[in-house]
Design a protein with these regions (language model features):
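Secretory targeting and sorting signals
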Residues: 2-31
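Glycan-processing catalytic domains of CAZymes
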Residues: 32-273
């Protein structure tokens, strides 16, 4: 996600409803749980109240249990201040693209930089080149830990469904996404699945919850049912639908939905709870 010109990341939606429309709670509950070998970490509750802001000065006064804010832009002092108010803090970090405005952009060699993803200055990366990409991401996760964050929101974990410039397969994406979850856990933080609805059945056991964008608008919400069945939170952000158009549906599913302005500058926050 670029912090300059907000737009929804481009991704293929074909077949999502067909695959997941018949998903039952019983089937979802049967999904295997993957044990974490890392240190103990925060376990987000299913009914997690949350606030999301990635640009601008962040106020600490939102009446929620968790904040999701930018890992690079947020100082450790603000994370500490939020902790002193009894809040948990989630670290937004991009793991699927390289953003030319980030301080570590020069760490990405040209060989892993693909096509733009619709955001200025942002390109998909070749997640198959694990020997190159993983050390960069580990340093990003370590930055989150050093600042005191409790969890990570890894963005753009669905390059295989986009025109990335690389012939990424679903299996390669799963390998990378599972590594992301395990690496974050190894550093003592929780981790949320960000979008990627088609791979939820395989990913739920690795992640501690999910954050989805516009699942009501794009009719993808049922794909995240396995998280609810497992007692994990599903945080849904809608940008264009009025709350009266989606809050009842989110509540009936057990999702924690809210409406935000697309720029995520803190200008709009209309929660469903």
């Amino acid at each position: 996600m670029s912090l300059a010109v907000p737009a929804r990341p481009l991704r293929a939606m074909i077949g999502c409803l067909v695959v997941f429309a018949g998903l039952s709670a019983a089937t979802a509950a049967a999904a295997p749980e993957i044990a974490s070998d890392g240190p103990a970490h925060w376990t987000p509750p299913a009914q997690l109240t949350w606030y999301w802001q990635l640009q601008g000065k962040v106020s600490n006064s939102q009446p929620v249990a968790a904040y999701d804010i930018d890992g690079f832009e947020t100082a450790a002092a603000q994370v500490s201040a939020l902790h002193s108010l009894g809040k948990h803090v989630i670290c937004y970090i991009d793991v699927g693209t390289a953003e030319n405005f980030r301080p570590d952009y020069s760490s990405f060699p040209a060989s892993v930089l693909g096509k733009g993803n619709g955001w200025p200055g942002e390109k998909w990366i070749d997640i198959r080149q694990l020997g190159v990409v993983e050390p960069i991401m580990t340093r990003r996760f370590e930055l989150c830990r050093e600042k005191g964050f409790d969890a990570v929101e890894p963005d753009n974990i669905e390059g295989f469904e986009n025109t990335s410039g690389f012939p990424l397969t679903a299996a390669e994406q799963l390998t990378y996404d599972e590594w992301v979850a395990e690496e974050v856990h190894s550093l003592g933080m929780a981790v949320l699945q960000k979008n990627d609805p088609t791979q939820t059945p395989e990913l739920e056991g690795y992640f501690d919850g999910a954050l989805t964008e516009q699942c009501n608008q794009y009719k993808e919400c049922e794909a995240f049912a396995p998280y609810v069945a497992a007692g994990k939170p599903v945080l849904n952000a809608e940008y264009h639908l009025a709350t009266k158009k989606f809050c009842a549906a989110d509540q009936s599913r057990g999702f924690m939905g809210a409406r935000f302005a697309l720029a995520l500058k803190g200008k709009k926050f209309q929660p469903c709870w």
